[in-house]
């Protein structure tokens, strides 16, 4: 038997209903904030991620699915969404659109060769938001407010917004020098990843998860001491907006994001819930990227965004015992007796469905009792039984499955019966 590739999953019908609910809710929220959907290819030129994400990052070094196509071009399955959206912004000359900033969101599969663990897959579905074309603390605050709004709208609590400023490029240059000076004397005792990062991306050492390295990280210089006046003022304004919005936050000077393109505001949303046995789990992350467009041969424009994993959102809802609203009922199940009635039901189903009525029938030649059981299994709200007598005189009894009440109507009035019910429900 051929099995599913390691690190992937089948999303079966009982789960896909939850996915549709989440995706529909996210779409509704994006309308409130005036963000428009963008769809980019699942694969891109490898150079896009090497340049846009950063050669020294774990994503590029270890996690990308890269291959040569038949034209001998190096192609990579997208490991994240921002670089592709920025590439599209540049290629489609969106900077010429007077409606700046361009507010975009995306939702789709991403691919990273990661170690399998709970809530993480090698093919995962990422929802992300990008606002490109404005460097203003108020839009940073809007993005942070949106992140909180998303998770709160699903009923999640125990949320902790963690923020930091990684400064502009000048600030980071000075800070990187200080980090190298701090870590150089002890770098031989660090893990291999940290040793490799010392001269390429020393800020990433601050994010090391190896216990023996954490002591040296605790005493490392803080970026807040190396921010220039412009970076300090920008971050202070972002925090002032959050205070005005009554959005609580925690500052963490060691918070750095895993990709090279971040500048100024960086953030993560965490959940600190008893349901996680005391563990703090990251739900979402993002930040500002002021040099990415120029790095990809684009205009001197700025952007900010975030991304979240649908899988991890589902896991958080499950861990906190939050049920997802489902409306998967079937309006009508048609029970048939005999071949003539079954043939009639095929035409009747077609007519019902064209009028927006969710309907189904038996396809396994079950007896009446078996068909009624099937109607219950599929959650039918109503059933009708059609046999020779019903076909002859055109009269049917429509039964409400929960109450057992029945109405006698003519077959020709079946569509209007449901349309009238829906009108009455709409008036309530």
Swiss-Prot record:
<dbReference type="Pfam" id="PF03129">
    <property type="entry name" value="HGTP_anticodon"/>
</dbReference>
<keyword id="KW-0648">Protein biosynthesis</keyword>
<dbReference type="InterPro" id="IPR004516">
    <property type="entry name" value="HisRS/HisZ"/>
</dbReference>
<keyword id="KW-0067">ATP-binding</keyword>
<dbReference type="GO" id="GO:0140096">
    <property type="term" value="F:catalytic activity, acting on a protein"/>
</dbReference>
<dbReference type="Pfam" id="PF13393">
    <property type="entry name" value="tRNA-synt_His"/>
</dbReference>
<dbReference type="InterPro" id="IPR041715">
    <property type="entry name" value="HisRS-like_core"/>
</dbReference>
<dbReference type="InterPro" id="IPR006195">
    <property type="entry name" value="aa-tRNA-synth_II"/>
</dbReference>
<comment type="subunit">
    <text>Homodimer.</text>
</comment>
<dbReference type="InterPro" id="IPR004154">
    <property type="entry name" value="Anticodon-bd"/>
</dbReference>
<dbReference type="GO" id="GO:0005524">
    <property type="term" value="F:ATP binding"/>
</dbReference>
<dbReference type="GO" id="GO:0005737">
    <property type="term" value="C:cytoplasm"/>
</dbReference>
<keyword id="KW-0030">Aminoacyl-tRNA synthetase</keyword>
<dbReference type="InterPro" id="IPR036621">
    <property type="entry name" value="Anticodon-bd_dom_sf"/>
</dbReference>
<keyword id="KW-0436">Ligase</keyword>
<comment type="similarity">
    <text>Belongs to the class-II aminoacyl-tRNA synthetase family.</text>
</comment>
<keyword id="KW-0547">Nucleotide-binding</keyword>
<keyword id="KW-0963">Cytoplasm</keyword>
<dbReference type="InterPro" id="IPR033656">
    <property type="entry name" value="HisRS_anticodon"/>
</dbReference>
<protein>
    <recommendedName>
        <fullName>Histidine--tRNA ligase</fullName>
        <ecNumber>6.1.1.21</ecNumber>
    </recommendedName>
</protein>
<dbReference type="GO" id="GO:0016740">
    <property type="term" value="F:transferase activity"/>
</dbReference>
<dbReference type="InterPro" id="IPR045864">
    <property type="entry name" value="aa-tRNA-synth_II/BPL/LPL"/>
</dbReference>
<dbReference type="GO" id="GO:0006427">
    <property type="term" value="P:histidyl-tRNA aminoacylation"/>
</dbReference>
<dbReference type="GO" id="GO:0004821">
    <property type="term" value="F:histidine-tRNA ligase activity"/>
</dbReference>
<dbReference type="InterPro" id="IPR015807">
    <property type="entry name" value="His-tRNA-ligase"/>
</dbReference>
């Amino acid at each position: 038997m051929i099995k599913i590739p390691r690190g992937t999953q089948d999303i079966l019908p009982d789960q896909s209903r939850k996915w549709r609910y989440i995706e529909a809710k996210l779409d509704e929220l994006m309308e409130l904030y005036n963000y428009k959907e963008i769809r980019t290819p699942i694969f891109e030129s490898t150079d896009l991620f090497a340049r846009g994400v950063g050669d020294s990052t774990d994503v590029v070094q270890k996690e990308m699915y890269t291959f040569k196509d038949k034209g001998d071009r190096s192609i990579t399955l997208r490991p994240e969404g921002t670089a592709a959206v920025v590439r599209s912004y540049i290629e489609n000359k969106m900077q010429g659109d007077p409606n700046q900033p361009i507010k975009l969101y995306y939702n789709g599969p991403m691919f990273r060769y990661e170690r399998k663990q709970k809530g993480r897959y090698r093919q995962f579905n990422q929802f992300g938001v990008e606002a490109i074309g404005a460097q203003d603390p108020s839009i940073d605050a809007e993005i942070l407010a949106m992140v909180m709004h998303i998770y709160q709208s699903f009923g999640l609590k125990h949320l902790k917004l963690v923020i930091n400023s990684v400064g502009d490029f000048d600030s980071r240059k000075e800070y990187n020098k200080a980090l190298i000076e701090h870590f150089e004397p002890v770098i031989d005792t660090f893990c291999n990843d940290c040793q490799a990062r010392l001269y390429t991306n020393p800020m990433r050492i601050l994010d090391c998860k190896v216990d023996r390295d954490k002591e040296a990280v605790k005493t490392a210089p803080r970026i807040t001491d190396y921010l220039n006046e412009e970076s300090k003022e920008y971050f202070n304004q972002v925090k002032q907006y959050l205070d005005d919005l009554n959005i609580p936050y925690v500052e963490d000077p060691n918070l750095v994001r895993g990709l090279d393109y971040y500048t100024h505001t960086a953030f993560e949303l965490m959940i600190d819930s008893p349901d996680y046995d005391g563990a703090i789990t990251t739900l979402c992350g993002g930040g500002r990227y002021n040099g990415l467009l120029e790095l990809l041969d684009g205009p001197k424009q700025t952007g900010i965004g975030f991304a979240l994993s649908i899988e991890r959102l589902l896991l958080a809802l499950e861990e906190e015992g939050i049920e997802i609203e489902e409306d998967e009922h079937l309006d009508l199940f048609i029970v048939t007796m005999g071949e003539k009635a079954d043939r009639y039901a095929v035409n009747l189903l077609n007519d019902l469905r064209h009028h927006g009525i969710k309907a189904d029938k038996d396809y396994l030649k079950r007896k009446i009792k078996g068909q009624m059981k099937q109607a219950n299994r599929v959650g039918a709200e109503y059933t009708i039984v059609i046999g020779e007598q019903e076909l002859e005189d055109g009269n049917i009894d429509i039964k409400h499955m929960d109450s057992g009440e029945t109405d006698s109507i003519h077959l020709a009035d079946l569509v209007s019966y449901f349309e009238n019910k829906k009108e009455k429900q709409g008036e309530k």
